[in-house]
Amino acid sequence: MKNSFYILLLVLLFSSCNEYQKALKSEDITEKFKLGEQLYNEGKYSKANRLFEQIIPKYRGKPQAEKLMFLNANASYEMEQYYISGYHFERFVSAYPNSEKLEEAMFKSAKSYYQLSPIFSKDQEDTVTALEKLQTFVNVYPESKYLAETNKLVKELELKLEEKAYSIAKQYNHVSDYQASIASFDNFIIDFPGSSFREKALFYRFDSAYQLATKSVEYKKEVRLQTAKSYYTTFKKAYANSEFIEDADKMYNDIEKQLEKYNTKS
């Protein structure tokens, strides 16, 4: 009985494979579409995708093309081929602006780019693209069923950009390029006013300004000490109980001590 079951299973598998290979070689686009949709519904996206790609050009302009293009894009999405799915969903949105699948296609196009977004330490071009597409989606569908997920994705991507900008500024501080560090932290503070990195950004901007001032040639020192002092004031006003306050106070006291000689001269 058990042997009969395995034999039957092998026959069915062989028959299925034979049917698929036959469809691949066939000129019958209806047969390809029918089998492709069946395979898609069974979760066999790679095989379905291969059949769909063969017949898409031949269905262009026909009523079935809308469904075919969506299934093809979604098959790539389900296979985690996000560059391909993002591209195909974009084409679908452009080709079928009145489709009942438009909302889902636009969301999955944006989410494809979200999936392509790398860790914060790498280039963030795909992160920026994903944010733009997610924002466009929210603008078009402000009450979408995907809105909660979209907002979550946006927050995650924005945090990644914050981390990237902060890490660049902090790296300048680490390698003693203090002017670049100050400029980068200035931009960070303006671009991300509510960031969780704001406390650190204000402190390390002050630290960079202090290091720059104390290591400056004499004729630049006084102005730079005054600038560093102003950064200290901003930091302390915002974070009087910061974990960095002790270090900040030490640097501030040193600044005051160094400024005394300029006050004496005047």
Describe each PLM feature range.
Residues 5, 13-266:
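Acidic, polar-rich low-complexity tracts and alpha-helical solenoid repeat scaffolds
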Residues 2-8:
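Sec-dependent signal peptide recognition
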